[in-house]
Curated annotation (Swiss-Prot):
GO molecular function: IMP cyclohydrolase activity; phosphoribosylaminoimidazolecarboxamide formyltransferase activity
Organism of origin: Chlorobium phaeobacteroides (strain BS1)
Name of the molecule in the record: Bifunctional purine biosynthesis protein PurH
UniProtKB keywords: Hydrolase, Multifunctional enzyme, Purine biosynthesis, Transferase
Gene: purH
Gene3D superfamilies from the UniProt entry: 3.40.140.20, Methylglyoxal synthase-like domain (3.40.50.1380)
Ranges where the MGS-like domain occurs: 1-149
Reaction equations catalysed: (6R)-10-formyltetrahydrofolate + 5-amino-1-(5-phospho-beta-D-ribosyl)imidazole-4-carboxamide = 5-formamido-1-(5-phospho-D-ribosyl)imidazole-4-carboxamide + (6S)-5,6,7,8-tetrahydrofolate; IMP + H2O = 5-formamido-1-(5-phospho-D-ribosyl)imidazole-4-carboxamide
Pathway(s) annotated for this protein in UniProt: Purine metabolism; IMP biosynthesis via de novo pathway; 5-formamido-1-(5-phospho-D-ribosyl)imidazole-4-carboxamide from 5-amino-1-(5-phospho-D-ribosyl)imidazole-4-carboxamide (10-formyl THF route): step 1/1; Purine metabolism; IMP biosynthesis via de novo pathway; IMP from 5-formamido-1-(5-phospho-D-ribosyl)imidazole-4-carboxamide: step 1/1
UniProt similarity note: Belongs to the PurH family.
InterPro entries, per database record: AICAR_Tfase_dup_dom_sf, Cytidine_deaminase-like, MGS-like_dom, MGS-like_dom_sf, PurH-like
Notes on the domains: The IMP cyclohydrolase activity resides in the N-terminal region.
Gene Ontology biological-process annotations: 'de novo' IMP biosynthetic process
SUPFAM superfamilies in the record: Cytidine deaminase-like (SSF53927), Methylglyoxal synthase-like (SSF52335)
Length: 525
């Protein structure tokens, strides 16, 4: 069958960008246009010849527009196989005219339910019924019908029609049909996820089934190691789309590697803990913080963070919670860093930093989503959990020792607790005056983590006397706490919950330590 000439088009869109110009060109090629509701009004007000869909159906739009295109004269006109004699005869006998083009995009359901104040009733009213039905009918019969779901395809279709005497090519129709089923499957999944969450009142990590769509956003040279293939995919699990370009803009440097992406995720997750607080700087290496600090100025925060470990930051990732100023940029420029991340860059800073071509500069466009579902693939299935977004407040703390923490110790305890959540377990973090002074990460023994943190502090020439220490999980024995006391710590924050808590508390009292329990663990694997 030859490519069918487009003579009649049905146009009904929620996104009206470019639709007037598109329909005006269709009309100039002799295409008869039918439309509904707001689209019809916009076309007519713009001087584009268009008729109501009711002229086809002989039936008015009813029930606040819920029923307008669900009619045999619409779907018969879309689904009729044009070289099937029986279909043609049945269409003729029932007064059904063929429809050669459908231009439809759907009610903005995902955007509606993403609004924090949306009501259930508003969400339901934004479930499109007629739109998906017309799209699917048109896509199924793509041998005869051209179907368009987004304005980005208007120009391609118009150009083809002009080149082919009013027809589109089969390859284009097939491609556009594929877009339909991608769109409707995502749309239906979003609705299903929303209704499931509304009826169950549960996080999606507790749902019986989860649909996740991954679409490649970035090609990567290789994965964690050069012999591994890799890519970065934007993700939509029904709770909202997540993509690199949505949150970041690369201003300078080479493409990010697989490991760069992991470190960027770690750096931004940690700096988010200090979003609305005093100037803060985070230095990350292999997804672990090797230095974190707050101060009255950004440059002071950077110098304090760097002094925690003056070797590991080379080739690391630095993130800050303030626009990057020239003084701080010059201090950072003294060493090689893979990536700098900032919410803004002050005048002249980019020009100076861009002199090093291998350094990547990222602009963080907006805060990261807080309540998201996390996925971790194994070779035998997928783990799903809520993100560890909770952080203990001062009101959550329970002092379990004879000595109460001082105001300064309490500040440092809260600072250390925020950081230990982002360090690989087992975790011990020493803090003094809003600065990490020792970080022990990823050891099988909590005592070993405490020893490593103390050793790193000694290498950096930092004094642990009077410091506060955080442990991501309880001390199973008193030995871990005693190691911290021996290092000079005077205040401890930990979840508590060990069967030997009494022994640990007694050891703290014996060394005049102030200790608080959070009743919240922060394992990170």
């Amino acid at each position: 069958m030859s490519d069918p000439v487009i003579k009649r088009a049905l146009v009904s869109v929620s996104d009206k960008s470019g639709v007037v110009e598109f329909c005006r060109e269709l009309s100039s090629m002799g295409v008869e246009i039918f439309s509904t509701g707001g689209t019809l009004r916009k076309l007519q007000e713009s001087g584009v010849a268009a008729a109501s869909i009711s002229t086809i159906t002989g039936f008015p739009e009813i029930m606040d527009g819920r029923v307008k295109t669900l009619h045999p004269k619409i779907h018969g006109g879309l689904l009729a196989v044009r070289d099937n004699a029986d279909h043609i005869a049945q269409a003729r006998d029932n007064g059904i005219g063929f429809i050669d083009m459908v231009v439809v995009n759907l009610y903005p359901f995902q955007e509606t339910v993403a609004k924090p104040d949306v009501t259930f009733e508003e969400a339901i009213e934004n479930i499109d019924i007629g739109g998906p039905s017309m799209l699917r009918s048109a896509a199924k019969n793509h041998e005869s019908v051209t179907v368009i779901t987004e304005s980005a395809d208007y120009r391609t279709v118009l150009d083809e029609m002009r080149e082919n005497n009013g027809a589109t090519t089969r390859s284009t129709r097939l491609k556009l049909a594929g877009k339909v089923f991608t769109l409707t499957s995502r749309y239906d999944r979003a609705i299903a996820d929303y209704l499931a969450a509304s009826s169950e009142g549960e996080a999606s990590s507790e749902a019986g089934s989860i649909s996740v769509r991954l679409e490649k956003e970035i090609d990567m040279r290789y994965g964690e190691n050069p012999h591994q293939n890799a890519g970065f995919y934007r993700m939509d699990d029904g709770s909202g789309s997540r993509s690199f370009e949505e949150y970041f803009r690369k201003l300078h440097g080479k493409d990010l590697s697989y490991n760069n992406m992991l470190d960027t995720a770690a750096a931004t997750a940690l700096i988010e803990e200090f979003r609305d607080e005093a100037p803060a700087v985070v230095i990350i290496k292999h997804t672990n913080p090797c230095g974190v600090a707050q101060a009255d100025t950004l440059v002071e925060a950077y110098r304090k963070a760097f002094s925690t470990d003056t070797q590991s930051p080379f080739g690391g990732i630095i993130a800050c919670n303030r626009p990057l100023d020239m003084e701080t940029a010059k201090a950072i420029d003294e060493i090689f860093t893979e990536i700098l991340i900032a919410p803004a860059y002050e005048e002249g800073v980019l020009d100076m930093l861009m002199k090093k071509k291998n350094r990547r500069l990222l602009l963080q466009r907006k805060p990261l989503l807080q309540e998201v579902t996390e996925y971790k693939s194994t070779r035998f299935g997928m783990l799903v959990q809520e993100r560890d977004s909770r952080i203990a407040s001062r009101d959550d703390l329970k002092v379990v020792t004879k000595r109460q923490p001082s105001a300064q110790e309490l500040d440092d305890l809260m600072f250390a607790w925020k950081i230990c959540k982002h360090v690989k377990s087992n975790t011990i973090v020493y803090v003094k005056n809003r600065q990490t002074v020792g970080v022990g990460a990823g050891q099988m023994s909590r005592v070993d983590s405490a020893k490593i943190a103390r050793s790193k502090a000694a290498e950096a020439g930092l004094d642990l006397n009077g410091s506060a220490v955080a442990s991501d999980a309880f001390f199973p024995f008193a030995d871990g706490l005693l190691a911290a006391a021996e290092a000079g710590a005077m205040a401890v924050i930990q979840p508590g919950g060990s069967v030997r808590d009494d022994e640990v508390i007694a050891a703290a009292d014996e060394h005049d330590l102030a200790m608080v329990f959070t009743s919240m663990r922060h394992f990170k694997h």
